[in-house]
């Protein structure tokens, strides 16, 4: 009889451990599935950008007017703000701010969020950085789709294209049949003026960081520190867009459209995709004052009961 009890206890322990192991395996599989779905969505969001940047899709071939002064600017060598500086500043500044902000919230304020990732630091960074990168992919895909679909000529197009005007009859007005003598890669790039990628990317990254600071920067010691930081970020984006006009890379309307697109994507990502401004449930504070209970004598209880019965 004793051996049977020992056998039953051992079998119960093995069954319990086996159930816990199976549950852990299912949770691990679910985590990998959710991460895979997120990565797949991120890939789809950035797919148009990846395809267009590899020159798999050529921009629309637009004609021009011989006397169009807006595309006769000289081509400048280099950019005031290069693509590398723009990408590094926009991505690194925002991600570094998110890492510092989320780590501070978890370590000092004990504020976390529920997620399928167990570690609170990894969970917070996975959500916030992932949402930000997803918005980057959306913004850049929108920008490149507009560039190749519209095919607007940059202000320095004629200087880069170098068409042979001896074979062009300018009296016809709009010239659609022409051949460029400049380098093909530069000519194709000169057809991507609308809208400004520098303006849209800088506005998205800086404005998203502005929204992040508005949600997470809760220190009230210096009332003007947060708005000063936010306006500085917006001014950095503003200067980046204006530099594209002075570099003869974009028309002013291209920059304005880029600003609007970047701001719209940043707003949608911050308010509808991330949890930065979602309402959080408040815990009810427990009252420290003890509740006073009225002690009723048994005679009064019987009298009240009889009164209820008669009623």
Language model features with spans:
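N-terminal transmembrane-helix/juxtamembrane module of multi-pass inner/ER membrane proteins
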Residues: 1-131, 141-158, 173, 177-189, ...
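Membrane-embedded catalytic cores of phosphoryl/pyrophosphoryl-handling enzymes
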Residues: 123-127, 131, 138, 164-311
């Amino acid at each position: 009889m004793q051996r049977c009890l020992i056998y039953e206890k051992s079998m119960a322990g093995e069954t319990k451990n086996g159930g816990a192991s199976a549950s852990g395996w299912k949770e691990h599989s679910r985590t990998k599935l959710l991460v895979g779905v997120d990565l797949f969505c991120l890939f789809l969001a950035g797919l148009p950008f990846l395809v267009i940047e590899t020159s798999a899709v050529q921009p629309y071939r637009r004609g021009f007017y011989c006397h169009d002064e807006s595309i006769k600017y000289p081509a400048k060598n280099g950019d005031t703000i290069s693509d590398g500086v723009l990408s590094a500043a926009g991505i690194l500044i925002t991600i570094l701010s998110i890492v510092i902000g989320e780590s501070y919230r978890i370590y000092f304020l004990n504020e976390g969020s529920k997620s399928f990732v167990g570690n609170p630091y990894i969970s917070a960074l996975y959500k916030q950085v992932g949402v930000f990168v997803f918005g980057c992919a959306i913004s850049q895909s929108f920008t490149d789709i507009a560039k190749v679909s519209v095919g607007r000529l940059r202000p320095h197009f004629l200087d880069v294209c170098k068409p042979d005007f001896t074979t062009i009859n300018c009296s016809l007005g709009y010239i659609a049949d022409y051949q460029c003598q400049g380098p093909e890669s530069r000519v194709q790039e000169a057809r991507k003026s609308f809208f400004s990628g520098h303006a849209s990317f800088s506005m998205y990254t800086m404005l998203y960081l502005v929204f992040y600071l508005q949600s997470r920067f809760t220190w009230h010691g210096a009332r003007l520190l947060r708005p000063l930081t936010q306006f500085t970020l917006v001014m950095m984006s503003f200067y980046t867009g204006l530099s594209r006009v002075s570099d003869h890379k974009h028309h002013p309307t291209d920059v304005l459209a880029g600003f609007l697109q970047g701001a719209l994507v940043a707003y949608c990502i911050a308010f509808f995709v991330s949890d930065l401004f979602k309402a959080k449930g408040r815990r009810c504070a427990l009252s420290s004052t003890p509740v006073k209970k009225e002690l009723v004598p048994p005679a009064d209880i019987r009298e009240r009961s009889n009164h209820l019965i008669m009623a």
